């Protein structure tokens, strides 16, 4: 993890600004959302905290942590008047923006931090109607949700000729991870969307920053749902590729109190563990022959340490006059992305001649290689294209 147990929590830093800013958080009851809200409220800014009503009303640890945060807001002088809670899901984006503007007159910073993880290989996620629905839900939560709230806030920020959109992503936006294919796909889709609209909104003085946190941030601080495993992808059947399910299962299995919350299932329901010792140490929640959903039961202290670097980066970047387009949190994340880029660069160089051989060459004296298809006169291609389409060649 990016944060060791002994690493000190960094002191919050904020960019210079002339007046308090208004932040809109899309997942105000998440550990990241709560921590950012505390920091910016303490700094003197305003917070509009979006929550899903059903999640707030249940009895989960997550809802209890948010209720504890609200109690702290009431006790702390000056916080209550600068916090507004609004219902927010994929159907309520326009209403949330309107409520924020009505109460605090503007939205300066939109922080998209809504996420959940679907665990399973592509075959496991194609095995039933239920798992196919999980895939659709993954994109609804991780892609269409952020896309809709971003789309809703742009007209307001455009009218102000000012604004900053921050999207919390992960290094999985650079790195494919076995067992997290749909999680990675939804993240890559969101980053592609953000990279594109950043150019569209730049003339309106609206900035957009993608913050890529470690994979632990996105997975361990949000809801996890796993599809039933297939035996063909277990080590018992000789599957040698690393699989995120096994890594996450082992980590969750070591969390204090996990056995009390989730008693071990019968041995026949376990697919992944490869030894009797592992089976006896269960419960291996994510390897059961059923769909399993849970929030990892991390302690408050562990969670604070885990997210500290990311929260520090968010407060330092939020509302900055010249923020980065992309920020990678933590030295481990930077090293992983550098290694991926190095591999891509090496493969590019290895096959550069093959790439160049596909360029279109103009015929005639004194005519060199065209740098791209766009450099070629369309008339030079019309005959070939139409002949090919008619089956004449």
Residue ranges with predicted function:
Residues 4-54:
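Canonical Rossmann dinucleotide-binding motif of NAD(H)/NADP(H)-dependent dehydrogenases/reductases
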Residues 73-93:
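Rossmann-fold cofactor-recognition segment
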Residues 89-104:
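Conserved Rossmann-fold cofactor-binding substructure of NAD(P)-dependent oxidoreductases
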Residues 117-136, 179-182:
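Conserved mid-core segment of classical short-chain dehydrogenase/reductases
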Residues 150, 186:
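Active-site helix of classical SDR
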Residues 170:
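Residue(s) in the substrate-gating loop at a strand-loop-helix junction
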Residues 203-323:
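SDR active-site lid
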């Amino acid at each position: 993890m990016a944060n060791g147990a002994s690493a000190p929590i960094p002191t919050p830093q904020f960019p210079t600004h002339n007046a308090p800013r208004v932040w809109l958080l899309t997942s105000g009851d998440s550990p990241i959302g709560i921590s950012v809200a505390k920091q910016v409220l303490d700094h003197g800014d305003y917070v509009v905290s979006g929550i899903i009503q059903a999640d707030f009303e249940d009895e989960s640890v997550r809802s209890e942590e948010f209720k504890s945060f609200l109690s702290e807001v009431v006790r702390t002088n000056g916080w209550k008047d600068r916090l507004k809670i609004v219902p927010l899901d994929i159907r309520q984006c326009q209403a949330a923006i309107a409520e924020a503007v009505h109460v605090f007159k503007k939205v300066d910073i939109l922080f998209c931090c809504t996420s959940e993880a679907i665990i399973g290989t592509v075959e496991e996620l194609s095995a039933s109607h239920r798992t196919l629905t999980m895939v659709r839900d993954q994109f609804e939560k991780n892609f269409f949700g952020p896309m809709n709230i971003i789309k809703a806030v742009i007209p307001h920020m455009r009218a102000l000729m000012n604004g900053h959109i921050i999207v919390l992503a992960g290094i999985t936006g650079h790195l494919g991870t076995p067992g997290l294919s749909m999680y990675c796909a939804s993240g890559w889709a969101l980053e592609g969307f953000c990279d594109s609209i950043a150019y569209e909104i730049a003339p309106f003085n609206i900035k957009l920053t993608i913050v890529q946190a470690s994979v632990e941030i996105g997975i361990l601080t949000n809801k996890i749902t796993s599809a039933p495993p297939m035996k063909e992808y277990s080590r018992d059947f000789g599957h040698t590729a690393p699989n995120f399910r096994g890594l996450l299962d082992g980590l969750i299995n070591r969390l204090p109190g996990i056995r009390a919350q989730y008693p071990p299932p019968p041995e026949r329901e376990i697919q992944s563990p490869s030894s009797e010792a592992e089976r006896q140490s269960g419960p291996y929640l994510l390897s059961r022959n059923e769909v399993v959903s849970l929030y990892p039961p991390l302690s408050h202290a562990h969670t604070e340490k885990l997210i500290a670097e990311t929260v520090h980066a968010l407060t330092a970047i939020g509302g900055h006059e010249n923020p980065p387009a992309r920020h990678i949190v933590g030295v481990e994340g930077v090293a992983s992305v550098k290694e991926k880029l190095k591999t891509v660069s090496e493969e590019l160089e290895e096959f550069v001649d093959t790439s160049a051989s596909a360029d279109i060459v103009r015929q005639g004296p004194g005519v060199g290689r065209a740098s791209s298809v766009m450099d070629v006169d369309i008339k030079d291609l019309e005959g070939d294209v139409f002949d090919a389409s008619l089956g004449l060649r």
